[in-house]
Amino acid sequence: MITTELWKENEGANLRNFHEEQDLKSVNGALALRKDIEKIIDKIWDEGFDNIFYIGIGGTYASAMQVEVYMRGRSKLPVYVENAAEFLTTGNKRFTNKSIAILSSVSGNTLEMIELVDKVHEIGGKVFSFIDTPNTVLTQPDKQDYLILYPKNEQLKFYMTANYFMFKNGEFAE
């Protein structure tokens, strides 16, 4: 039988695994990527594209769905979200040789994401990757066209990307 007496906080209520100083440093490091992200998007914008696809598997797919909903409600840019395994199985007729696939991987070695990158390149599309772990398969030159290498803060990186695409499209007054 479980009772409430079996569980007591040693130091009162607290957030487990929350380390304020480390988390602030990590977020500030991700925010410092803004200029690099903007340079990449400027290049993508200048080269031209027809669609933006946020593609992921697992938690990255969840992050991709959030940013797609965010953009869809605020932008006229053609933005889509795909589950990597489904894309590999069924494809998407909207994805062309002028499309951009934006993805993220913590390990840099996720099988579905590796196969996805190969499929995108086979179609002729471009890959903009956020990879957390250096010296992995997805950091190799043939596995991405644009690379940001920085751990954690996937959603922040995706939202900075979305916001700058919308800024380039004249969808922010400031």
Q: Which positions does each model-derived feature cover?
A:
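Glycine-rich phosphate-binding loops that contact phosphosugars or nucleotide phosphates
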Residues: 45-174
